[in-house]
Amino acid sequence: GLPVGGYTAWLERMAADDRIEVRLDTDWFDVRDDLRRQSPAAPVVYTGPLDRYFDYVEGRLGWRTLDFELEVLDTGDFQGTPVMNYNDPDVPYTRIHEFRHFHPERDYPSDKTVIMREYSRSAAADDEPYYPINTETDRALLSAYRARARQETAAARVLFGGRLGTYQYLDMHMAIASALNMY
């Protein structure tokens, strides 16, 4: 299930802790040397693409990305569920989200609903990666990157997490469990 108030409220409460510094529009690779000099023993949780962390030294891992299409429909309920997945070869999108069903306790207009379609495609170098690709080539690269990640964790206290940092498909409950198990 969802946290009370949704993930945004949950993350806002965590980020409000005085021990947490939040930097927006900041690329880790632009600030990491300064941050490591300031706090060399501090652990780092890296959740970006695993291959990018190591400057693609083993090669580029394959990723899928998503394009989104938002639409307001003139109906009070489009699909009766928060997310409907589609794997039919003749359907161009992979899923449809209908946001009103994530929080049924809230009041919504009875004559309108908002949906979002997700379209999956191979990620180009400048796209935001979302999902790992499980090919033989990617598995070989991943093995080499995981060996590097283990060394980096031991030497520099860098913890690799999330879908991108572990190159794993993770549902939210799996990502949360993985983060809790890091410590």
State what each model feature region is.
Residues G1-R13, R23:
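Short beta-strand to alpha-helix junction loop
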Residues E152-Q168, A175-S178:
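Short FAD-binding loop at a beta-strand-to-alpha-helix junction that anchors the flavin cofactor
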Residues V22-R23, D55, T166-Q168:
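Domain-scale detector for complete catalytic domains at protein termini or as standalone homologs
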Residues T26-R148:
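Mid-domain catalytic core of redox enzymes
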Residues D18, P40-A42, A155-A156:
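Short, well-ordered alpha-helix to beta-strand connector turns
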Residues V22-L24, Y46, F160:
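A structural signal for the hydrophobic beta-strands that form the central parallel beta-sheet
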Residues A15-F29:
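A conserved beta-strand/loop element that lines the FAD pocket in flavoprotein oxidoreductases
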